[in-house]
Amino acid sequence: MTNYGADLLWVLIFASLGFSAFAVFVSISRQRRSRPPTVAHIAGEDVAAEAARKVIREFEKNGQSADAALVTWSPETLRKILADDLPGAQVIVVSNREPYIHNSKNDDVELLVPASGLVSALEPITRACGGTWIAYGGGTADRLMVDDNDRVQVPPGNPSYTLRRVWLTEEEYQSYYLGFANEGLWPLCHIAFTRPIFRASDWEAYQAVNRKFADTVVAEARNERPIVLVQDYHFALLPRMIRERLPEAIVITFWHIPWPNSEVYSICPWRERILEGLLGSSIIGFHTQFHANNFTESVDRFLESRIERADAAISYGGQTTLVHAYPISIEWPADLLAKLPDADDCRARLRNRFGLKADVKLAVGVERLDYTKGILDRFHALDELFKRYPEWIGKLVFLQIAAPSRGTLPAYKLLHDECHRYAEELNQRYGSEGYKPVIMVAEHHSQEQVYEIYRAADICMVTSLHDGMNLVAKEFVTARDDEQGVLMLSTFAGASRELLEALIVNPYDAAMMSEALLQALNMTPDEQRERMRPMRQMVRDNNVYRWAGSMLLDAARLRKRGDLDRVTGAGDRPPSIDNVVSMFERKRVALS
């Protein structure tokens, strides 16, 4: 009875860890009862049992401490997860774009923080976690600011992590970044009806640059078990390259753009190679479950693999990869809000800058000049509004901030010309002395300037033709601590799954968008507040620290499972999905 009582306790412990752990217990129990209890065997079993108990206690202790911490998601939460659940782990972030750029200006060095959704999401995370951020050094003074190992400590004045710059030749940059990544993968993954262009020379450069970044990751790793956060479509081959050289690393790849359905994906000449590269990841994250499902379907169609849809796991080449949705977000509260004037002052400053009358309604759009963002479709909607409701002519101005982007590529040159031409047409058709309905500003703006624009706007238009998430929508909501303003949001942006109180529109339907514009223009302050308040609460509760914390907790569970498997001998078996996902009960922490 004593043995069975102890076994019952073990059942409960292992069941809490998942089915595969329970299977390990059953196997050990059967072996124990099938042979005589010799002294030597009992001693060895006690040692193994005690080792298993130690790992389980650590596993449970860490899980409980993390659960207790996850009430408010903040930098402190992330640091606690790292300290309690991933002690000693080195965090390495890899992205194409760097968080700080040094440029030469008038015999001096100017520091720039790029207005990038990826940077605005990841920079506060890296500040909180420390570690190393590896990125392409493209600033004209970047080489002047690094040490002999191509490193610079950032942020300036209060450094908390290392920026490791990787140098690319002009040919590498043109072919890897502008070529394969942005003429090939970018249009392939976005339903914007721009034809992808694939060249063998671009593919060769893409492979070479991914290898260069893999070399840098290995060089920067302080041990064999770093946590590597690979960012976006520039590095589809990198996870497999890291896995081959650092097999014990936890590689978390986050794909920031949509993943197409398998029929569209089949266009890519190197489709199998890209999937194989990504499946070197321990975890692959997407903004939405829809895109995660598309990825899984692509793997199912093009690779011989084992897929467990219930567990969201793919087994390929002796390794299991978990595929999940992690909706990205932004920092809350945004540090820069404390530095900004209130909404009324921002309105006055912006209207003074552009010579707008006090009673004119202001709609804004803020993004890179990109064919996926639906800028021309906003112009169509404005045209339709003025045709249907001419009384709004002279009473509404649309300000489009369109940061120059990839301007050497033909598709972007064409978009630039079309946008400026259409804006001028609208101004000629509906403008008058002292009034232009469209103001097009093709300049880079700092994050502070962008937030001032958000606070000054009556309406923010986010009308992407296709977007993984779109953080402009969340930034606008965050900026509006006055709980005023109306968000118009494309149904084809991932953010529309979360910001449900926005006016959700189809950017291809100009008539629908014009009616939504009219609704926004006539919306009362009370209704604006009723819509803005829950959206702000959603961003607050689901901020970028929760996004990162969810992935780090999942990484911790994977690492603990690996440690447990090694102790119990499960690690000696061929890798299988059961070894990995059975313990992976998605987010047992209270996330509400």
What is the predicted role of each segment?
Residues 10-591:
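Catalytic cores of carbohydrate-active enzymes across secretory and cytosolic contexts
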Residues 1-6:
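Short, strongly hydrophobic alpha-helical membrane anchors
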